Structure formats: structure tokens, C-alpha cells
Amino acid sequence: MMDVVFDYEDIQLIPAKSIVGSRSECDTTVEFGGRRFKLPVVPANMQTIIDEKIATFLAENGYFYIMHRFEPETRLNFVREMQQRGLIASISVGVKTEEYTFIETLAQEGLTPEYITIDIAHGHSEAVIRMIQHIKQILPESFVIAGNVGTPEAVRELEHAGADATKVGIGPGKVCITKIKTGFGTGGWQLAALRWCAKAASKPIIADGGIRTHGDIAKSVRFGATMVMIGSLFAGHEESPGEMQEVDGLQVKEYFGSASEFQKGEKKNVEGKKMFIEFKGSLSDTLTEMEQDLQSAISYAGGNKLQAIRTVDYVVVKNSIFNGDKVY
């Protein structure tokens, strides 16, 4: 096991001499699956975070996205429509029998999604390995992301099975209670788990869960993430799915976990909860702010491209960097 475990708020990155005149010279783009995207960030493939409208907006504007899998019957049309518009199709699948049929149907219809994410809570499993192999056999051109995992062994096995990228994070999310319900997961040490997994990986990693600030995106990149999946920071926008509500005089929107009873429609194997997120305005404003903050991070790292962040020094600050300042 690991000697030092730490999470996002235990780490500070150390500045290196700046080489840019202005942060606007810094390039936040990232290459992933043979395409270049504006930010190393992807909104979580959750029902309260993404829908077809947001997916289209992201794709049209050069951002990566992954559509959720909770309305399975809409996926075929979704892939067809996105590709007809000249946009990338990026979808999620589970591992049940009907998902095997769905992959075959895509092939029969002549549809190859550019990205397919196999997305289950405990991704280090034979079921996921079989699904990776199935997709690679039937739709060899699709870029396959598999998860979620939390160990180097899991990363190696899924890569070996044919996954093009792995998604790391078991239960660190804000509306995920896996850590409480089961005692398992990377909650509280997600950043160290990412570092541990990245050392074993030969393909890209998506860090998934536990991001609470824009600085955490830079920290994820430092410890090996190519993409960073974000839920709560993307919840509560104008465009976000769900109705605006008023609670205690505040404008809010619902945000719930993918394994919550609100998601499943039943109280069975519940490992997610629901919360209200204060209204945040428009999604494009948040994306712009993320980009600017990341540009600043790159300039502090002493470079002008995202990769500069990967080599900076860091310290582990065991008393939490916020010193009582609550940012979330």
C-alpha cells in the first residue's frame, strides 16, 4: 500500500519562474482520443449534469462530453443526430445483457460512436473486461473509456483488455455515499489514488470525483490526469437539467448521485444522495472562468501549455490549505 495518502486540499503546487507576459498566452487545450479539446475537463455523465442540449453545446464549442446512460432507448438516435450534425458522439453503456445487443445494433445501423464509456461503480470486474472486448470486436474504431477503478492493478487489467482510457475514482463525489455505505473507495485520498494509478497507466486517465475548486483541476493534471470529470461544480447552471426551485429564499437546482433512489426510482442498493446546489448562472461563463483559472495555473507552473503543470513541485500540507476559509 501507499506510504503517504493525501487529497486535493492537502496539496499545494509550487510556482516556477513565469515565461509568459500574460496568462492569456497559456494554452489549456488537451489531446484525447485523437482529438483536441479546449479544456482537460468533462462534465460528469450524470442525469442532473448533462442532457442532449448541453452535450450539443459542448461538442459545438470544442469541449469533450460524455452523455449519461439513464435513458438507454434514446442513445441510438443521439449518436445518429450528433454525427449528422458533424459533431462527435460520446455515450455511456453499462454491462447488462441488453447493452451487448445495443452495441451490435449500433454496428448494424452503421453507427460508430467516437467515444464509448463503460461506466459502472466497481469497474475492476470481469463484466467490464468482457464489455471492453465486445466493443473492441464489434466497433473497433470507437475509443473506449472504462471505469470506475481505484487501483493500479485495475488500470493495468482494463488497459490490457483493450480500454483506451480508464476512469479513476470510487466514491469521492459530493453526492456519492459509497464511502459511508460500504467502507470502500477513494474518498478522502482521491488525489493520491490518482497518482498511484497514473504511475501504472500507459494510456490516459480520467480523474473522476472530489473536485471542489478550479485549482483541483490543475492538481489532477499534476498527478497524471489527462481529463478531469466534474459533477457538483457543473450542477446548478441555467442550462442544467431540472427545474429551478426556491429554498430558504435561494434559487437552487437539484443534484443527485447516479446510484441514488432519485436516479433509480427505487430504494435498492442506494449509494447516492440528493442535494440542492445554489444557482450558478450560465454554463459558458463557468467554462470561461475554468479556462482562465487554468491559464493562470499554467503561468504559475512556468510554462505556456498544460503539460507544464505535470512537472511542478508540490508540498503536502496536512492542516488543509483553506485554514478555515470555506470555499465549498
Swiss-Prot record:
CDD domains: IMPDH (cd00381). The keyword Oxidoreductase applies. Keywords: NADP, Oxidoreductase. Its EC number is 1.7.1.7. InterPro entries: Aldolase_TIM, GMP_reductase, GuaC_type_2, IMP_DH/GMP_Rdtase_CS, IMP_DH_GMPRt. It holds the Pfam family IMPDH. GO terms for molecular function: GMP reductase activity. NADP(+) binds at residues 205-228. GO terms for biological process: purine nucleotide metabolic process. GO terms for cellular component: cytosol; GMP reductase complex. NCBIfam families: GMP_reduct_2 (TIGR01306), PRK05458.1 (NF003966). This is GMP reductase. It comes from Exiguobacterium sibiricum (strain DSM 17290 / CCUG 55495 / CIP 109462 / JCM 13490 / 255-15). The gene is guaC.
